[in-house]
């Protein structure tokens, strides 16, 4: 394969991976918005018509689910970033795994990375704990003080 042709393939592959990264980041952003909106509605508007303790309990469960989903999307974004880095470093040398968009293909990760990022570690990052931790803490506080 010629150098120009190989560069064109790499550019297209990078564009595809960047699209996946952007989609995961957008999904994470949307999840945060939905989580905050739903919990705010549940805690602010509905206690007059429903049992407040039940709503606080539901808020904790819903927030935990959104927290997990957000961590999942951030983990996937991280995996696509590993793939992006591998393509930049290796595509000029080889056609192996050309257009492979499977983020779990460990052969397309940097040799420094041995294991897939753990979703629980992603959940306790400094970007997610303040958002979801504060919502859960407030919901639990209301649950035990109402």
Q: Model-found features: residue ranges?
A:
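A hydrophobic membrane-anchoring alpha-helix module
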Residues: 97-146
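Cytosolic-side membrane-entry/anchor segment at the start of a transmembrane helix
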Residues: 1-45
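Hydrophobic alpha-helical transmembrane segments
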Residues: 42-61, 66, 137-146
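Inner-leaflet juxtamembrane helices
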Residues: 55-108
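Hydrophobic alpha-helical transmembrane segments of multipass integral membrane proteins
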Residues: 34-37, 41, 60, 64, ...
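Membrane-water interface of alpha-helical transmembrane segments
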Residues: 26, 49, 53-56, 122, ...
């Amino acid at each position: 394969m010629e150098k120009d042709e190989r560069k064109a393939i790499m550019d297209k592959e990078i564009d595809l991976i960047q699209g996946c990264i952007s989609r995961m980041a957008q999904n994470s952003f949307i999840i945060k918005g939905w989580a905050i909106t739903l919990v705010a509605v549940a805690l602010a508007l509905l206690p007059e018509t429903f049992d407040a303790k039940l709503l606080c309990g539901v808020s904790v469960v819903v927030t935990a689910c959104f927290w997990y989903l957000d961590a999942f999307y951030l983990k996937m974004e991280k995996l696509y970033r590993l793939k992006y880095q591998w393509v930049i470093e290796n595509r000029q040398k080889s056609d192996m795994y050309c257009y492979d968009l499977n983020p779990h293909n460990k052969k397309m990760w940097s040799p420094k990375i041995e294991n897939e990022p753990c979703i629980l570690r992603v959940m306790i990052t400094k970007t997610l704990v303040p958002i979801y931790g504060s919502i859960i803490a407030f919901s639990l506080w209301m649950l035990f003080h109402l």
